[in-house]
Every structure is written in C-alpha cells, then in structure tokens.
C-alpha cells in the first residue's frame, strides 16, 4: 500500500451467486473504498470456488480476482467474516428476515436489497439523493434492538426509478397525486424467475407485491424524519406493474399532479438541476437524472447503461389533461435499482459517518 493510501474497508456479500449477488460482485471487485473478502451463499454452494458455485450470466466475465474465491456459508460467526465491517445482502426476503439480524448482532453494517425490513419504523429505507438524513434512524435501531451493527435498506427497484424523479418535483411544486405504470424487465425476477414460454410474445400484468411496495415505500422515502420517526409523505399514489420481455431495464410511465401546478419545461428544469451528491466524489455515483429530448427515448436497450447503470433516464416530459405532467423514466433495475443502490448507500454512509 502506497504512502497516504487509505486502507480499504473489508466487505462481504450474502446471496452472492444470484442475479443481484453477481451485480454486487461486479461492482465491488475493484472498488476504491471496499475490498471484497467474503462471498456467502447456500449450503449447496458453500465450499466451492465462486466460478463453480454460480451460473454466471452477466455481460462481462467473473472478475479474475474473485472467480477462485471459496464460497462460505451464511454464518456471521464464520472466520471469513471476522474482519468484515460491511455486508451487502442480496438474500431473498424470507432468508434476509432470518440472517440479517444475526449479522447485525455481530456488529456488522448490513446494506440490504431485501424487502424484509424496509418498512420497519427503526430501519432506514434510503436513497441518498432523496433522504440521506433517514440514516439517523440507525442509532434508534441500535438502542431498540440492542445490537452494535445495523440494517440499512434500499427500496424496491421500481420504487427507486420513480422516487428519484419525483423528489425534485416535490421539493419545488409539492405532490398531490401520482400514478405509475411499469414495464419491468425479467432480470428483476432472477434467472429462473419467469419461464421463457410465459414471457416471449407476451406481457404479464402482475408482479406479486410490487404495486404495494411502490405505494408504501415511496411515501416513506419522501417522508420527513421528525422526533426519531418518519412521517409519511402526504400525497396519493397508485401503481400498476407489468413484466415485459426485456432482459434489463425497467421503464415507467409516470403521471404527476402537483400542489402548485407545473409546466413540462419547469419539470424538465428541476429534474436536470437535481444533483445533490455531486461534490462528495462517491465512486458509484452518477448524475441521478439524465434528460433525453428525442421523441422515442428512453429505451431499455439504448439507455439502461447511462451513468454506468446508475442514472435514471427521463424523456417525453409533456402536459397531461388529467394530471399536470407525464413522462417516461428508465433505470437499470439490477444496478441502480438493486446492487448499485446498496453500494451507493454504503459509500455515502462511510463518507459521512466513518
């Protein structure tokens, strides 16, 4: 290590062999702040080299410095976790409910992509560009639950896409009502989540619990932290969620009625200026909202990798006869909407609190 170089924080990944787990591996393999030293998965995978334990289906090969790492059980007392300070969780919700508290009790900071604890009143549900102050709930969580670690969550993928675009609108004009129709990529369900015969030549107008997550999480994210609790935002929100035959990239049609009234050009201006973390030099951070002027953008294949997959791409901002405005938003669902969201939360936390 060269003189003046900061020592990296050792991190681990739970659920490392799955779709989101693989994205975590990609993002952390050569990270300037974090050193990936522990990969945990099921008992079936434990003991195998990572390259043998997972069916890798990302757009780039398994990182050279990771592929021969040995997968370990999801056990916070395992020796590989001894020096790990931060753990990223890509576990399914039921397993997250069981294992994440065990890691918190061992003093680990859990940055979780799982839904298990998102709506607990003492658990921060965070998009750092939107509500970084909610991280103050960590101290309340520690006191209430009696552990030295903490669970910090990021929202559902489709929620992130919508809320990042709604935040600058709410701050300037207020929100009265929001309607969202989603067209969500199959990668959001995992590699085996949607059978090919079900999605090819088809659209599935139902994703279990997705609409409820969007509606409840949005109000918490855009709520106000007061006296140690989050007061939910006060506007009406409705979502209708669909699975479509796209590999990566959630697209959303968003309709917004504001309290003050707003024109499309005004919405475009506040979105374009929205860049609250630009001075922090966070490695994973990108400009949150990128505006496209073309009449047929954004599109998943063309726009999902904007900002290395961390930017929300917005287009077709126009007047609406029922609401005030409507627009189309696109995110890379497994990067900005999942692993990238957790990593950005961790980067922000380290920058501000460590």
From Swiss-Prot:
Subunit structure: Homodimer.
Binding site for phosphate: 118, 213
Protein's gene: asd
Entry binding sites for NADP(+): 17-20, 42-45, 187-188, 333-334
Superkingdom of the source species: Archaea
Domain description: Consists of two domains, an N-terminal nucleotide-binding domain and a C-terminal dimerization domain.
Catalytic residues, chain numbering: 157 (acyl-thioester intermediate), 250 (proton acceptor)
Any one Pfam family match given in the protein's UniProt record, by short name: Semialdhyde_dh
SMART domains, per the entry: Semialdhyde_dh
Reaction catalysis annotation: L-aspartate 4-semialdehyde + phosphate + NADP(+) = 4-phospho-L-aspartate + NADPH + H(+)
General function of this protein: Catalyzes the NADPH-dependent formation of L-aspartate-semialdehyde (L-ASA) by the reductive dephosphorylation of L-aspartyl-4-phosphate. To a lesser extent, is able to use NAD instead of NADP.
HAMAP family attached to this UniProt entry: ASADH
InterPro entries: ASADH-related (IPR051823), Asp-semialdehyde_DH_CS (IPR000319), Asp_semi-ald_DH_pep-lack (IPR005676), Asp_semialdehyde_DH (IPR012080), NAD(P)-bd_dom_sf (IPR036291), Semialdehyde_DH_NAD-bd (IPR000534), Semialdhyde_DH_dimer_dom (IPR012280)
EC number(s) recorded for this UniProt protein: 1.2.1.11
Gene Ontology process terms (BP): 'de novo' L-methionine biosynthetic process; diaminopimelate biosynthetic process; lysine biosynthetic process via diaminopimelate; methionine biosynthetic process; threonine biosynthetic process
Activity's thermal dependence: Optimum temperature is 70 degrees Celsius.
Identification of the protein by name: Aspartate-semialdehyde dehydrogenase
Class of the enzyme per the UniProt entry, highest EC level: oxidoreductase
């Amino acid at each position: 290590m060269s003189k003046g170089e900061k020592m990296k924080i050792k991190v681990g990944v739970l659920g490392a062999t799955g779709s989101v787990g693989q994205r975590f591996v990609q993002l952390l393999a050569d990270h300037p702040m974090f050193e990936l030293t522990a990969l945990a998965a099921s008992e079936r995978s434990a003991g195998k080299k990572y390259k043998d334990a997972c069916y890798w289906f990302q757009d780039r090969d398994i990182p050279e410095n990771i592929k021969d790492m040995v997968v370990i059980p999801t056990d916070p007392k395992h020796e590989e976790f001894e020096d790990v300070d931060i753990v990223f969780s890509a576990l399914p919700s039921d397993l997250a409910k069981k294992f994440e508290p065990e890691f918190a009790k061992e003093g680990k900071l859990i940055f979780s992509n799982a839904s298990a604890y998102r709506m607990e009143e003492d658990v921060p549900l965070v998009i750092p560009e939107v509500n970084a102050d909610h991280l103050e709930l960590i101290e309340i969580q520690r006191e209430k639950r009696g552990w030295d670690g903490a669970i910090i969550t990021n929202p559902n993928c489709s929620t992130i896409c919508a809320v990042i675009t709604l935040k600058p609108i709410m701050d300037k004009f207020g929100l009265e009502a929001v309607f969202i129709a989603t067209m969500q990529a199959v990668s959001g369900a995992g590699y085996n989540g949607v059978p090919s015969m079900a999605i090819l030549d088809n659209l599935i107008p139902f994703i279990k619990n997705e609409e409820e997550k969007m509606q409840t999480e949005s109000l918490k994210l855009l709520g106000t932290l007061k006296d140690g609790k989050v007061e939910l935002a006060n506007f009406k929100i409705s979502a209708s969620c669909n699975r479509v035959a796209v590999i990566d990239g959630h697209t959303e049609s968003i309709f917004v009625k504001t309290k003050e009234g707003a024109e499309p050009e005004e919405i475009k201006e506040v979105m374009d200026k929205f860049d609250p973390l630009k001075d922090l030099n966070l490695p994973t951070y990108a400009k949150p909202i990128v505006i496209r002027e073309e009449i047929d953008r954004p599109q998943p294949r063309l726009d999902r990798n904007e900002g290395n997959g961390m930017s929300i791409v917005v287009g077709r901002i126009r007047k609406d006869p029922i609401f005030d405005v409507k627009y189309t938003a696109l995110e890379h669902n497994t990067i900005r909407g999942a692993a990238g969201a957790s990593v950005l939360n961790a980067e922000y936390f380290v920058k501000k609190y460590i």
